[in-house]
Amino acid sequence: MTVVIGLTGGIASGKSTVSQMFRELSIPVIDADIIAREVVEKGKPAYNKIVEVFGTEVLQEDGELDRPKLGSVVFHNEEKRLQLNKIVHPAVHEEMNRQKEMYIKEGMQAVVLDIPLLFESKLTSLVDRVLVVAVKPHTQLERLMKRNNFSEEEATARIQSQMSLEEKVKNADEVINNDGTIMGTKTQLQAILKKWNIID
């Protein structure tokens, strides 16, 4: 039986590090962010719907989606953000499901759905187990400021726009504390996978 693991965490909690560790263990990872980019490529159904709803001003000169422009349109407008999610989320959901079923058919021991907004998008029904990568609030703030060149205000606003890490931790089957070393994170992951009988 393939175990479907939902991998999530707060912004800048180091989820991609853990995602990479799964890959090193030969466990396939389906990345929602990559799929979200693919489903809105020029000519795809979700792309056509976005152009229909938001107009051609959210396109680059070559006709591809201008992500930063679309991002700023929806970031300050709740109604538009919901409209965009209504187009993109089902398309991402469908493609993730398709890939998941493919790995299950292949008889994989486990498959990981890497979904930053697993709880916010109410996608927990797609997975059997939820693994949350968590860090202390000050670590999260520092990492985000450094990674995205954000001011403290910008970073705080971005963190607050998501469900709190505390809340995610409460709803997790297992939690990896990613404040320490990479080795420490790896040890925690291996212990969890042994507990779930995914690795020996």
Curated annotation (Swiss-Prot):
Positions of the DPCK domain: 4-200
Matches recorded under SUPFAM superfamilies: P-loop containing nucleoside triphosphate hydrolases
Catalytic function, reaction form: 3'-dephospho-CoA + ATP = ADP + CoA + H(+)
Enzyme class: transferase
InterPro entries: Depp_CoAkinase, P-loop_NTPase
Transmembrane segments: none
Pfam family, one: CoaE
Keywords, in A-Z order: ATP-binding, Coenzyme A biosynthesis, Cytoplasm, Kinase, Nucleotide-binding, Transferase
Listed GO MF terms: ATP binding; dephospho-CoA kinase activity
GO biological process: coenzyme A biosynthetic process
Entry keyword annotation includes Cytoplasm: yes
Protein's cellular compartments: Cytoplasm
EC identifiers of the protein: 2.7.1.24
Primary location recorded for the protein, binned into one broad class: cytoplasm
Residues bound to ATP: A12, S13, G14, K15, S16, T17
Pathway stated in the Swiss-Prot or TrEMBL entry: Cofactor biosynthesis; coenzyme A biosynthesis; CoA from (R)-pantothenate: step 5/5
Transferase found in the keyword field: yes
One GO term describing the cellular component: cytoplasm
PANTHER family, A to Z: BIFUNCTIONAL COENZYME A SYNTHASE-RELATED, DEPHOSPHO-COA KINASE-RELATED
Function as written in the Swiss-Prot or TrEMBL entry: Catalyzes the phosphorylation of the 3'-hydroxyl group of dephosphocoenzyme A to form coenzyme A.
Family: Belongs to the CoaE family.
Name of this chain's protein: Dephospho-CoA kinase
Gene (UniProt): coaE
